[in-house]
Amino acid sequence: MTETLSLRAKIEQSPMGAYQWMIVAMAAIMNLLDGFDVLALAFTATAIRNEFGLTRIELGYLLSAGLFGMAAGSLFLAPLADKIGRRPLLLMAVLLSTIGMLGSAFISQYQWLGFWRVITGLGVGGILVGTNVITSEYSSRKWRSFAISVYAAGFGVGAVLGGMFAVMLQGEYGWRSVFLAGAILTGLFLVLLFIWLPESIDFLTTKQPKNAEVRLNLIAKKIGLASDWKLPEKIEKVKTKLPISQLFSEKYLHSTLLIWTAFFAIMFSFYFISSWTPALLKEAGMTTEQSVSVGMMISLGGTCGALIYGLLA
């Protein structure tokens, strides 16, 4: 019999197969749709502001609503993965994004747009956390850094595609068509995820849901590691689990603050620039197409950077 605990080790040591790269591709496409969904409002901000007569402050609230939802989704939705599994969480998160984008396309008051942006953000937050774990689990040690960079690059690609859709659709069908297109694309991909997305190997071996062993062997077979994999003895309680307060202990406080500050600064600058650049350039005298194109170039640069740094890592 094969030791189940060595399955992850076997994946780490083995070459990446087509099935594993398909999982990386699905994670990248989920991140691509996130980029489309998150920045759709930035690319349509001028048209929305004109239709509802919004002030800059009101527009700022709308641009922040999706980011608030992302933060809430990452903090409160993503932890459900440890209880229900990565696959159900990701399916639920993609469904939330689909509903949020669809609702945004049919609003009659701008306050409702803020509500639907929060719903979209909740889904995006759950997706961002879950896809990172799935990508890491199914990647070999040799290709993990590159696989994660491919997944991360999806966000920028989605933003670029979002800009292209915004330019093509807004002039012909109005800003609502951009959100409708995002909802349709996200909904269609949800169906593909339901068919092909596997469960986390760690979740199957530690939580051991119904038919876990059968599902584990099916995954192993698709990877090309077909054997009689057995589940390890289930551990009911982890006594050594450390509380989150340990991050703020004297030993870790300095590192915690440095990491949090750096990450906050990066995310703040990225989303501030990405969200406001098209609208500000439009006010400065550029056409809608020109302002959106500049926003697309920012995302394109991020995509290239993610791939280059992934290869260097």
Segments predicted by a language model, with ranges:
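Cytosolic juxtamembrane N-terminal segment immediately preceding the first transmembrane helix
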Residues: 1-36
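Extracellular/periplasmic helix-loop-helix junction of adjacent transmembrane segments
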Residues: 31, 42-72
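Extracytoplasmic gate region of multi-pass secondary transporters
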Residues: 41-42, 248-306
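Helix-breaking motifs and short loop linkers at transmembrane-helix boundaries and internal kinks
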Residues: 53, 85, 106-112, 123, ...
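Conserved MFS/SLC helix-loop-helix module at the cytosolic interface between two early adjacent transmembrane helices
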Residues: 72-110
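Helix-loop junctions at membrane interfaces in 12-TM secondary transporters
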Residues: 105-116, 171-173
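Glycine-rich segments within core transmembrane alpha-helices of 12-TM secondary carriers
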Residues: 145-171, 185-186
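Central mid-sequence intracellular linker of multi-pass
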Residues: 175-237, 247
